[in-house]
């Protein structure tokens, strides 16, 4: 048991915890980041469809239970970087109406005390941090911003481009996904991403995704002496003197 004092303790290293650690690292505060998992191994199985989807190699085997005590298999993984290690890299901004009261089939999502306008500058920062590629103005549902995406949209594969154009000819509005991947289409020799067909749902063997591990936790822990990362540290309970 450590008796060290920390100014900030962050539980989890996914999109929330990892991003927070990266943002606070330059503050000089003494920061401890606790992660119940370890670093996801780079191995041939990263791109093995059977291992990834049939054997659930990178998902926890634990079972959760809903309010009716029915079992749930969460399909989540415990790694440095959290579930961003296996996401497809699509990073959308919430729409303005998402912060309002929204009536769903199963209930009501209450109105937020903060609105999209409060988050807009932080969305812009996050898109830079996660190297998001996209084109403003294509998505007719996107919320307002005066800032372009940090990188140009990823070009479509030929067949997808044909479908894109066919939909446009029908008066529809297809758009390029905002993708957080380390792809350099100007100079492919400098590109980490190789544009393979094992992305969404797979770990990336070549570290081509802009995830919370590569873009946040490793820079924070490696470059700032005030940030400590403790892996395989599951938090079961939090005590407070308040």
Which residues are covered by each model-predicted region?
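Conserved redox-cofactor binding core of oxidoreductases
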Residues: 103-232
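Residue-level "edge-of-site" marker
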Residues: 37, 180, 235
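N-terminal glycine-rich phosphate/pyrophosphate-binding loop and immediately adjacent elements
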Residues: 1-125
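Glycine-rich anion-binding loop/nest that anchors nucleotide
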Residues: 12, 232-235
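Conserved beta-strand-loop-beta-strand element in the redox core of flavoprotein oxidoreductases
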Residues: 237-242
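Generic recognition of flexible, low-complexity loop/linker segments
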Residues: 19-22, 215-218, 234-236
């Amino acid at each position: 048991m450590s008796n060290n004092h920390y100014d900030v303790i962050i539980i989890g290293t996914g999109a929330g915890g990892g991003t927070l650690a990266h943002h606070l690292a330059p503050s000089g505060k003494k920061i401890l980041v606790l992660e119940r998992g370890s670093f996801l191994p780079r191995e041939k199985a990263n791109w093995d469809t059977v291992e990834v989807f049939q054997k659930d190699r990178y998902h926890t085997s634990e079972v959760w239970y809903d309010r009716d005590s029915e079992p749930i298999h969460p399909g989540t993984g415990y790694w440095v970087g959290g579930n961003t290690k296996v996401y497809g890299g699509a990073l959308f901004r919430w729409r303005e109406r998402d912060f309002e009261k929204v009536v769903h089939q199963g209930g009501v999502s209450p109105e937020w005390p903060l609105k999209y306008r409060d988050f807009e500058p932080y969305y812009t920062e996050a898109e830079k941090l996660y190297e998001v590629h996209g084109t403003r103005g294509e998505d007719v549902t996107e919320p307002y911003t005066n800032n372009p995406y940090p990188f140009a949209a990823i070009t479509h594969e030929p067949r997808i481009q044909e479908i894109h154009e066919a939909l446009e000819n029908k008066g529809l509005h297809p758009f390029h996904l905002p993708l957080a991947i380390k792809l350099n289409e100007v100079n492919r020799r400098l590109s980490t991403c190789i544009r393979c067909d094992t992305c969404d749902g797979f770990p990336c063997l070549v570290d081509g995704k802009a995830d919370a591990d590569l873009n946040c936790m490793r820079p924070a822990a490696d470059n700032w002496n005030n940030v400590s990362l403790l892996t395989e540290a599951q938090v079961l309970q939090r005590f407070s003197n308040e």
